[in-house]
Amino acid sequence: MHLSIILNPRADVLHAENAAEMAALYRRLLTDAARAGERELMLSAAAADGIPPAQAAHVTLHAIVETLRTLPPLAVTLRCPDEKTLCAHTADWNMFYQEEKPE
C-alpha cells in the first residue's frame, strides 16, 4: 500500500453529507479504480458540513487504508486544498497509520 498526502491548492474538494457518506465515497472510488485495473489514483480530500477537519481526515484515511488492504496494489495520492487540511491529514496519518513513529 502506498499513500501520499500532498498540498495542491488547485485540488477540488469532494463533498459529502456526513461521515458515513464520506467513507462510502472513498471506498467506491478505490474499488472502481481497482476494478478498472488502475495502478495509481489521485483523490481529493473530502469535507462535510459540520464535521471538523480532524474528524474528516480520520474518516478519510480510515476508509482509504481499510479499503486498500482489500485491493490489489494501488498507489494513492491524496490532494489537500490548503494547509489546514494537509495538517489534519498528516497528523492523523502519523498518529494512526505511519509504521515508524517519530520519537
Describe every region a protein language model picked out:
Residues 1-20:
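N-terminal beta-strand/alpha-helix entry module and adjacent surface
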Residues 18-103:
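Phosphate/ribose-phosphate-bearing ligand recognition and processing surfaces
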